């Protein structure tokens, strides 16, 4: 464990909530370890470097799932040599150099694809340990940083993807994607459902409007699911879309088997108490579902990491892809009317999930810090960071 004063710099990004959630899980775990010699700082590199342009890019990113799918698809699946010619590779370079000079971290942890880090590792022979947490289930080129000391990945399959891309197997740890440890705690499902006037004996279907307020078609889906699966009950989470919540509350106010929620901090309890979930295939959400052994239906996943995550979970029989609301309704009907199929998915998830992901990752981070202590004692931090001035 850490016996000298050490500092970890976490570089994250606010494109969606997942990267921030991973960062918070890691920070919380390290804080729980009560390491008096360790300090952890976190920075949203792109937002701090170029706040106006990054805000515009974030809006484009959010809208790309709805309006610009082909454009985002072309970006996501572009060849590595095309990325090298793109300004994105150098985005945030000056801010990153200034951060390193100011903070002088002993280890850098990336929880967001940060191609600009490649510029530093290729052009400056820095030997500060760099670790990367990949928050999706299939490899995408932006996650690879030359000379990185460690990659933390979700599964053995993801590890094979990295090895096939030329990363040494010894540099890759299968920890699972870091999520809050509350998703591994026991929940009294019967008490939770009764507390919300739901029937513990009925299959509970959890539906989420998604982080970006998708607000159309849920009334149609709820109505048709209940027609085809009348023995079920539905919990609809509208997130921050107050208009959607009001509309659905009015439409289903007389239904005792439909509960409409707004934003909730209790997704853990709802996942634990449900048998099936309709959601977006974001890396963190589906990792939480996997930890809870909750089969999922992915409605119309966007090209890119959403689709790749959904395809992986479908290949592993953890979930199913529905390209239209009608397909989602049919899948729900099939699974709830043939409970053995749903149970088979649940059992497979229970057998194959990786537990204690955040603890595994943080323990390895501390080992890296320990192993780098001797080198730091010999060379000191100043020569490492002085290299930025001699290039």
Curated annotation (Swiss-Prot):
Catalyzed reaction equations: a 1,2-diacyl-3-O-(beta-D-glucopyranosyl)-sn-glycerol + UDP-alpha-D-glucose = a 1,2-diacyl-3-O-(beta-D-Glc-(1->6)-beta-D-Glc)-sn-glycerol + UDP + H(+); a 1,2-diacyl-sn-glycerol + UDP-alpha-D-glucose = a 1,2-diacyl-3-O-(beta-D-glucopyranosyl)-sn-glycerol + UDP + H(+)
SUPFAM superfamilies the UniProt entry points to: UDP-Glycosyltransferase/glycogen phosphorylase (SSF53756)
Cellular location(s): Cell membrane
GO CC aspect terms: plasma membrane
Principal cellular location given in the protein's record: membrane
GO molecular function, one term: 1,2-diacylglycerol 3-glucosyltransferase activity
GO biological process terms, semicolon-separated: enterobacterial common antigen biosynthetic process; glycolipid biosynthetic process; lipoteichoic acid biosynthetic process
Pathway(s): Glycolipid metabolism; diglucosyl-diacylglycerol biosynthesis
E.C. numbers: 2.4.1.315
Keyword annotations from UniProtKB, A to Z: Carbohydrate metabolism, Cell membrane, Glycosyltransferase, Lipid biosynthesis, Lipid metabolism, Membrane, Transferase
UniProt enzyme class: transferase
InterPro entries named in the record: Diacylglyc_glucosyltr_N (IPR009695), Glyco_trans_28_C (IPR007235), Glycosyltransf_28_UgtP (IPR050519), Pro_diacylglycrl_glcsylTrfase (IPR023589)
Matching Pfam families: Glyco_tran_28_C, MGDG_synth
Record Gene3D superfamilies: Glycogen Phosphorylase B
Family named by the database record: Belongs to the glycosyltransferase 28 family. UgtP subfamily.
HAMAP family, per database record: Diacylglyc_glucosyltr
Function recorded in the entry: Processive glucosyltransferase involved in the biosynthesis of both the bilayer- and non-bilayer-forming membrane glucolipids. Is able to successively transfer two glucosyl residues to diacylglycerol (DAG), thereby catalyzing the formation of beta-monoglucosyl-DAG (3-O-(beta-D-glucopyranosyl)-1,2-diacyl-sn-glycerol) and beta-diglucosyl-DAG (3-O-(beta-D-glucopyranosyl-beta-(1->6)-D-glucopyranosyl)-1,2-diacyl-sn-glycerol). Beta-diglucosyl-DAG is the predominant glycolipid found in Bacillales and is also used as a membrane anchor for lipoteichoic acid (LTA).
The protein, known as: Processive diacylglycerol beta-glucosyltransferase
Organism, scientific name: Staphylococcus haemolyticus (strain JCSC1435)
């Amino acid at each position: 464990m850490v016996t000298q004063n050490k500092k970890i710099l976490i570089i994250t990004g606010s494109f969606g909530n997942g990267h921030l959630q991973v960062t918070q899980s890691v920070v919380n775990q390290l804080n729980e370890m009560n390491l008096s010699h360790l300090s952890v700082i976190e920075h949203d590199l792109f937002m701090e470097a170029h706040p106006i342009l990054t805000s515009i890019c974030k809006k484009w990113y959010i809208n790309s799932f709805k309006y610009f799918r082909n454009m985002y698809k072309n970006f996501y699946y572009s060849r590595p040599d095309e990325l090298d010619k793109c300004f994105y590779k150098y985005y945030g370079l000056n801010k990153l150099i200034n951060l390193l000079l100011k903070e002088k971290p002993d280890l850098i942890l990336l929880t967001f694809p940060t191609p600009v880090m490649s510029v530093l590792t290729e052009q400056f022979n820095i030997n500060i340990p760099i670790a990367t947490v990949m928050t999706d289930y299939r490899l995408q080129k932006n996650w690879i940083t030359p000379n990185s000391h460690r990659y933390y990945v979700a599964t053995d399959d993801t590890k094979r993807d990295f090895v096939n891309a030329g990363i040494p197997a010894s540099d890759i740890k299968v920890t699972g994607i870091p999520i809050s440890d509350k998703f591994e705690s026991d929940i009294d499902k019967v008490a939770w459902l009764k507390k919300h006037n739901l029937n513990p004996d009925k299959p509970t279907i959890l539906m989420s409007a998604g982080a970006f307020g998708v607000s159309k078609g849920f009334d149609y889906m709820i109505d048709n699911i209940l027609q085809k699966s009348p023995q079920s009950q539905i919990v609809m989470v509208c997130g921050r879309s107050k208009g959607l919540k009001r509309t659905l509350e009015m439409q289903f106010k007389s239904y005792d088997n439909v509960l409409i929620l707004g934003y909730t901090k209790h997704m853990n309890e709802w996942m634990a108490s449900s048998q099936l979930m309709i959601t977006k295939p974001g890396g963190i959400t589906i990792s939480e579902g996997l930890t809870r052994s909750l089969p999922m239906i992915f409605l119309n996943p966007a090209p890119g990491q959403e689709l790749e995550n959904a395809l992986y979970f479908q290949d592993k029989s953890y979930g199913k892809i529905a390209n239209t609301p009608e397909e989602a309704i049919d899948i729900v009907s099939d699974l709830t009317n043939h409970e053995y199929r749903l149970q088979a998915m649940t059992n497979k998830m229970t057998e194959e999930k990786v537990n204690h992901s955040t603890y595994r990752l943080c323990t390895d981070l501390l080992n890296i810090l320990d192993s780098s202590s001797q080198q730091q004692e010999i060379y000191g931090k100043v020569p490492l960071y002085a290299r930025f001035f001699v290039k």
